[in-house]
């Protein structure tokens, strides 16, 4: 059966295991520099007729492959409840001195922030059954806590602005539409991303090295050079090249982002995030 089918993959793949590579190569008895670390969990959703499973019986190889009429609900659930929290927890954790996703989840403050974003905000924007969403979100947290995968938050922060636009911004809009107020955690996450792109050093001396398109890097560099968080807020939210629209048109967003930026500058990330929990 020839055809082109929409697909979705779900697996956390931190990449090259720098810390463990020597031990791994010793175990396999040869030098392999193409090793990739990944979690055991995996899911491949294929939007295709059931008969395609007969042509491609991946399940018989022990693989978690689903052939479904529509991959959209799986895509929406995964992007919202896994990728969405990833995108905002990473700058909050890193600027609080935490480097690994697992450690962020265990931290009493950052862990509470992650739970707020995932269960109290993003989950409220989806239309799937509540018990199904609760189960998926709980499973995602368990995956984040995987003791065998050291998922660096800096690897997640590559191209943070485009990621926020696709993973979190829809949730901001839907939450506002349904609740009549902005989701504090998601908006704080945007302020954290903006702060991360300021660069510089953490309190422990670790370099803050954002990585995005040159256009976005130049924009944030120039905005932060003004030393004015209002100008930074105005400039980022009005950047249609990032968002495809002017986010200043979202009621209350400018004021809340500015407030969060000021809190982060004044108190530091960890103390600032406590104010919304």
Task: Name each model-derived stretch.
Residues 1-277:
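Substrate/ligand-engaging "lid" and interaction regions
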């Amino acid at each position: 059966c020839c055809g082109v089918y929409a697909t979705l993959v779900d697996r956390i793949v931190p990449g090259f295991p720098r810390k463990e590579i020597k031990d791994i190569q010793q175990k396999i008895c040869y030098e392999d520099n193409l090793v990739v670390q990944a979690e055991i969990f995996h899911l491949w959703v294929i939007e295709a007729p059931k008969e395609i499973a007969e042509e491609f019986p991946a399940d018989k190889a022990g693989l978690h492959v689903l052939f479904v009429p529509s991959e959209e609900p799986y895509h929406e659930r995964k992007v919202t409840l896994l990728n969405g929290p990833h995108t905002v927890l990473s700058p909050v954790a890193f600027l609080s001195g935490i480097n690994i996703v697992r450690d962020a989840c265990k931290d009493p403050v950052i862990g509470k922030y992650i739970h707020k974003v995932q269960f109290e905000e993003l989950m409220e924007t989806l239309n799937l059954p509540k018990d199904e969403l609760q189960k998926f979100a709980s499973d995602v947290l368990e995956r984040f806590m995987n003791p065998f995968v050291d998922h660096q938050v800096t690897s997640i922060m590559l191209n943070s602005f485009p990621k926020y636009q696709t993973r979190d911004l829809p949730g901001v809009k839907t939450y506002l539409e349904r609740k009549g107020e902005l989701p504090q955690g998601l908006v704080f996450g945007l302020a954290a991303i903006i702060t991360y792109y300021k660069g510089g050093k953490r309190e422990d001396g670790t370099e803050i090295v954002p990585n995005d398109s040159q256009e976005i890097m130049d924009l944030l560099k120039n905005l932060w050079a003004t030393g004015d968080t209002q100008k930074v807020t105005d400039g980022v939210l009005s950047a249609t090249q990032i968002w495809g629209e002017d986010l200043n048109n979202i009621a209350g967003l400018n004021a809340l982002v500015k407030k969060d930026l000021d809190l982060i500058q004044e108190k530091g990330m960890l103390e600032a995030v406590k104010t919304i929990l």
